[in-house]
Swiss-Prot record:
Cited NCBIfam families: lepA (TIGR01393), small_GTP (TIGR00231)
Membrane topology term: Peripheral membrane protein
Top enzyme class: hydrolase
Organism: Borreliella afzelii (strain PKo)
Keywords, ordered alphabetically: Cell inner membrane, Cell membrane, GTP-binding, Hydrolase, Membrane, Nucleotide-binding, Protein biosynthesis
Name this polypeptide is given: Elongation factor 4
Protein purpose: Required for accurate and efficient protein synthesis under certain stress conditions. May act as a fidelity factor of the translation reaction, by catalyzing a one-codon backward translocation of tRNAs on improperly translocated ribosomes. Back-translocation proceeds from a post-translocation (POST) complex to a pre-translocation (PRE) complex, thus giving elongation factor G a second chance to translocate the tRNAs correctly. Binds to ribosomes in a GTP-dependent manner.
Length: 601
C-alpha cells in the first residue's frame, strides 16, 4: 500500500528578515490549531532572545490540516528555518526531510545572498521550489522586478510565483493551494522496513531527549524496539507523535510523516543528527544518507566574572549543550581570569546567543576572550596539528609554517556601492575571484578571504558602506598558508594571557597600539610607573606608560635651599623604584571586559 497523496512536506527558506516566521504564523492561524487568545507573533520562536532580535535560531516543525478548494483534506508538515548564515546547517537538515520548499523573497529588497545559497541547497536536493514574493503591502514593493529576478537569476518559472503579504494575510489561500498542487507527495511504502531520518532533537527535563524525525519508509508505533543504525544502540519507544505547536501524541506514524519519539534517552550526545532509525526485529538493509557533522569554526573562552560561580557556569554549559549539540566546550584556566571553558561556536551570532542565554537564563555574568579560528601548525619536527587559542601557539623558531581557514564570500550589492565593498574586502585580505552583473542595478561579488577577517566587523562594515543594501553569505574552503604571529600584552613585564591574540603579521602593530592605549585609559594609576607593552616574541612593537601618582614631598620645605628638596626627591625616587620591583599591578576584570569589547570593534 502506497502512502496517502494528501501528505505534503515542505520547508520555508529565505534570506534573514524576509518574513519566514510571520508566514508560519499565518499558516498556524489558518489551521486554527491554537486559539486566538493563546496566539502570539513568532509563534514557533520559543526562545526569548529569538523574539527580541526578531530572528529564528532553531528550526521548528509543525503539522497542520488544510481543506483545499477541491474538497480534499491535506496534512501539511512544514519547517520554519533560520535565515542567518551561522545557522545554515539547520536549513540543510530541514531540506533533507522535505519534498518541497517555499523560497520567500522580500518584494522591496529582492534576491539576497542567503536567498541564492538556500535556493541552490534546495535545488541540489531536488526539491520542488515555489517562489513566494512577500511584503507586497510595502510602498516600495516592486513585484514585476522581483519576478524578473526569479526568472533571470534563479531560472525558475516566474508565472508560478505567488504574491503575498504574510503580515496582512494577503494571498495565503493561494499559497496553500499551490502547495497542495505542486509539492510532490512523499514516496515510499508502509510495508517496507522502517527507515527514518533524525533531523533534530531537544531535551525535556522530565522525559529526556525528544527526537525529531521524518519517516521515509515503513511505520512505527508505541512499544516498538528501535535501533539507531550509526551508533548501533537500541531503545524502546515510549511515546510518538507530531508537532502541533505542543507535542500531540499518536499511536502510530508511517512513511511520509514528520514527528517525534521519546525512548528514555538521557543524553542528547547519544543521538547523532542524520542517523537512521529502524526496527530491531525487521531492520533496514542500509541507512539513509545523513548529514555532515557540524564543526565549530569560531573559538572563545568564557569565564565567570565572579570566580565563585564556576560550578554554576559548568551547570549552565551542560544545560545549554543538552539543547544545542553544535556547542562544544572543555575546561580551561587563565592566570588573569581564573577557571572557565574553551568553547567552539558556529559563528559570531551563535557566540552572542550563547552568551546572552547564559546571562539571562542562568543569571551569570561572564567574560568572553577574543574570538579566534582554528589554525593548522606545521612544525619543523613531528606531525601537523591544530590550535584554537594563543596559549597553544608554539615559538616561531619551532614552526615550519602556519595555515588558516579561508572562506568563499558571496556579496550582492547595488552597483553604486561596488567600489566601497571592494575597498572593504581588500582591507580584509580578500582576493576577488568573480564579478557577475545580475542586472544593470545589482552585482554579485565572489571573494576568497581568511575566515578570521570576517569575525568582528566585516558584516557591519559592508552594511555601513552600502547604506544597508549589501547582503553577505559565505561557505568554508580549505586551509592556506599565512604569516601569523602571537601578539602578547605585557604589563610591567608580565604577560597577560587573557589579552594574547593570534594576528596577521602586517596588522599586529595596529592592534598592539590600540590595546595598549585602551589599557592605559582603563588601568588606575599607581604610586610607581607602569609600562604597557605589545610584543611579538622578544620584540616590543608598541608601548604606553602610565605615570605614577606623586606626592608633593617638597611641600614642607621653606626657603631657597635646593639641596634639601633634591634629597627628598631622590629619596622618593628610590622608594618608587623599590615599590615597582615588588608591586604587582592589579587589573580588574572590568578592564579585561572593556578591552576585549573594544578589540571586537
Amino acid at each position: 500500500m502506497s502512502i496517502s497523496i494528501r501528505k505534503k512536506n515542505f520547508c520555508i527558506i529565505a534570506h534573514i528578515d524576509h518574513g519566514k516566521s510571520t508566514l508560519a504564523d499565518r499558516f498556524i492561524q489558518k489551521a486554527k490549531i491554537i486559539s486566538d487568545r493563546d496566539f502570539k507573533s513568532q509563534m514557533l520562536d520559543s526562545m526569548e532572545i529569538e523574539r527580541e532580535r526578531g530572528i529564528t535560531i532553531k528550526s521548528q516543525a509543525v503539522t497542520i490540516t488544510y481543506k483545499s478548494n477541491d474538497g480534499d483534506f491535506y496534512e501539511l508538515n512544514f519547517v520554519d528555518t533560520p535565515g542567518h548564515v551561522d545557522f545554515s546547517y539547520e536549513v540543510s537538515r530541514a531540506i533533507s526531510s522535505c519534498e518541497g520548499a517555499l523560497l520567500l523573497i522580500d518584494a522591496s529588497q529582492g534576491i539576497q545572498a542567503q536567498t541564492v545559497s538556500n535556493f541552490y541547497m534546495a535545488f541540489e536536493h531536488d526539491l520542488e521550489i515555489i517562489p513566494v514574493i512577500n511584503k507586497i503591502d510595502l510602498p516600495n514593493a516592486n513585484v514585476d522586478f522581483i519576478k524578473k529576478q526569479i526568472k533571470n537569476d534563479l531560472g525558475l518559472n516566474d508565472e508560478l510565483a505567488i504574491s503575498i503579504s504574510a503580515k496582512n494575510g494577503i494571498g495565503i489561500d493561494d499559497l496553500l493551494e499551490a502547495i497542495c498542487k505542486y509539492v510532490p507527495s512523499p514516496k515510499g511504502s508502509i510495508k517496507d522496513p522502517l527507515r527514518a531520518l533524525i533531523f533534530d532533537s531537544h531535551y525535556d527535563s522530565y522525559r529526556g531527549v525528544v527526537v525529531h524525525f521524518r519517516i521515509f519508509e515503513g511505520q512505527i508505533k508505541t512499544g516498538d524496539k528501535i535501533r539507531l543504525m550509526h551508533t548501533n544502540s537500541d531503545y524502546l519507544i515510549e511515546e510518538i507523535g507530531v508537532f502541533k505547536i505542543l507535542l500531540e501524541r499518536k499511536d502510530r506514524l508511517e512513511a511520509g510523516d514528520v514527528g517525534y519519539f521519546i525512548a528514555g534517552i538521557k543524553n542528547i550526545s547519544d543521538v547523532k543528527i542524520g542517523d537512521t532509525v529502524t526496527l530491531c526485529d525487521c531492520p533496514a538493509l542500509s541507512p539513509l544518507e545523513g548529514f555532515k557533522e557540524v564543526k565549530p569554526v569560531v573559538f572563545s573562552s568564557v569565564y565567570p566574572v565572579d570566580a565563585n560561580q564556576y560550578d554554576d557556569l559548568l551547570r549552565a554549559m551542560d544545560r545549554l549543550k543538552l539543547n544545542d549539540a553544535s556547542l562544544t566546550f572543555e575546561k580551561d584556566s587563565s592566570s588573569a581570569l581564573g577557571h572557565g571553558f574553551k568553547c567552539g561556536f558556529l559563528g559570531l551570532l551563535h557566540l552572542e546567543v550563547i552568551q546572552e542565554r547564559i546571562e539571562r537564563e542562568f543569571d551569570l555574568n561572564v567574560i568572553l576572550t577574543s574570538p579566534s579560528v582554528r589554525y593548522k601548525i606545521i612544525p619543523k619536527k613531528g606531525k601537523s596539528y591544530f590550535i584554537e587559542s594563543p596559549e597553544q601557539f608554539p615559538g616561531n623558531e619551532a614552526i615550519e609554517s602556519v595555515l588558516e581557514p579561508y572562506i568563499r564570500a558571496n556579496i550582492i550589492v547595488p552597483t553604486e556601492f561596488l567600489g566601497n565593498i571592494m575597498s572593504v574586502c581588500l582591507l580584509k585580505r580578500g582576493v576577488q575571484t568573480n564579478l557577475i552583473y545580475l542586472n544593470t542595478k545589482r552585482v554579485e561579488l565572489i571573494y576568497k578571504m581568511p575566515l578570521a577577517e570576517i569575525l568582528f566587523d566585516f558584516y557591519d562594515k559592508i552594511k555601513s558602506v552600502s547604506r544597508g543594501y549589501a547582503s553577505f553569505d559565505y561557505e568554508l574552503l580549505d586551509y592556506e598558508y599565512t604569516d601569523l604571529v602571537r601578539l602578547d600584552i605585557l604589563v610591567n613585564g608580565d604577560r597577560v594571557d587573557a589579552l594574547s591574540q593570534l594576528v596577521f603579521k602586517d596588522s599586529a602593530r595596529t592592534k598592539a597600539v590600540g590595546i595598549c592605549k585602551k589599557l592605559k585609559d582603563e588601568i588606575a594609576r599607581q604610586q610607581f610607573k607602569i609600562a604597557i607593552q605589545g610584543a611579538i616574541g622578544s620584540n616590543v612593537i608598541a608601548r604606553e606608560t602610565i605615570s605614577p601618582v606623586r606626592k608633593d614631598v617638597t611641600a614642607k620645605c621653606y626657603g631657597g635651599d635646593i639641596t634639601r628638596k633634591r634629597k627628598l626627591l631622590e629619596k622618593q625616587k628610590e622608594g618608587k623604584k623599590r615599590m615597582k620591583m615588588v608591586g604587582n599591578v592589579e587589573i580588574p576584570q572590568s578592564v579585561f571586559l572593556s578591552v576585549l569589547k573594544s578589540n571586537d570593534n
